[in-house]
Amino acid sequence: GLGDVYKRQVVMSRCFIGQACHLTHLFSAHDSLFFSNCQSENGEACAIFAGPYTVTMHKSSLLIAGMFSFLNAGSGSNQSNHMYKLGPIHQGVVERGSKTTSDSYILWPAKVGAFSLIMGRHVNHPDTSGMPFSYLIEHGNRSYLVPGANLKSVGTIRDAQKWPKRDKRTDPDKLDCINFNLLSPYTIQKMLQGIDTLQGLKQTSGETSECYSFQSTTIKNSSLNKGIDLYTLAVHKFMGNSIIKRLEGAPFSDLNDLHDRLKLTDSLGEGEWIDLSGLIVPKQAVKDEIDRIVGNPDSTLEETESFFQAMHRRYYDMEWTWVCSIMPRWYGKTVDRLSPGDIIRIVRQWNEAVVSLDRMLYDDARKEFSMISRIGFGVDGSTRQRDFDFEQVRGEFENDAFVKMVCKHIEDKTALGNELIDRLEALITSISQH
């Protein structure tokens, strides 16, 4: 059973529709695959691989010859896979969580990094897969990249909260393994590479260069430096999260206890990670499964499905293995060499990163309550009436649900970090007394 699939006035040819997809309002599609919870209305899809939560709602939107997931396609968004030479032979990838603004356009082949915002027309075949959470914006017929800018966007965080709530699958046997995490080995590995790339650009082109060239895009000097800072904050947040999860609620009375809590619990996890249309998994594990299938002619689909489910269940254990593998690079120590003092420093770095990113979200949300945002209110009244109308509809900034959530998140995470620091300081005192 594929769950609830709506097919009202939809024209489809040679398509596979996953669980809880919603297709309606004269949508047309051919030669395409839709994973679960996709929503498609009014527009058109031609030869696409639509991962979970691919959403296109507008009559003028075309998705063609691309791989997408967790996509929000704006009205008039389209791509071209034909350069009028050898036919429609080109294709592209827009990695998970990206948004295309109204009238955006990409000339395939191209590759866009995870959780990116695409605005304007891009015809020079950019590859921004190494720069997740970025803005890709056209200005003066050039593609400008703003690395990491989406990390401080309210919209990105709201999307991450909405996706799990919008899982409409009713079948207890959920066919797609979906990991909703914004920060994972998959995105953090790209940020680490991004930091190296951005620092390399500074060294090769000079720190005072006004602009830098990267994969058919232009990065402004200020954007490059902010990108390094944002990626660094995100890595601190992710690494700290992983360590705190390991020690949360876990009593330890001496150093041996502490290191026992930090031991690896899965042999898999090192190396590159990939996004298999919702399933975030180590690449080597998938390669091993492919080798098993090739070497076993009697292999069944059920066995492969069991493999995917097992990888999904083991995610956090494999994630910890990956985190430990990059500790020498990030902290200069292996996990078994971490002292209580080291962990206290890591937790403080984590707390600073969490609060810094949350304050950026807070400031981003405030823009929605600015004077410019009030222009559409009040119809024909005075400024005072306009402000009154705005407040009746939108409420006050401090009372906004998202703003309250950000403030509470800062409080909760600070308390969580302080609780662990207190326990570690008590351990240090205990060790020194002996």
Where are these regions (language model features)?
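Short, small-residue-biased leader/transition segments that mark boundaries at the very start
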Residues: L2-Y6
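Terminal amphipathic alpha-helical/low-complexity segments used for targeting or macromolecular assembly
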Residues: S129-H434
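Glycine-rich phosphate/diphosphate-binding loop of Rossmann-like nucleotide-binding domains
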Residues: Q9
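Glycine-rich hexapeptide-repeat left-handed beta-helix
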Residues: M12-S13, G18-G206
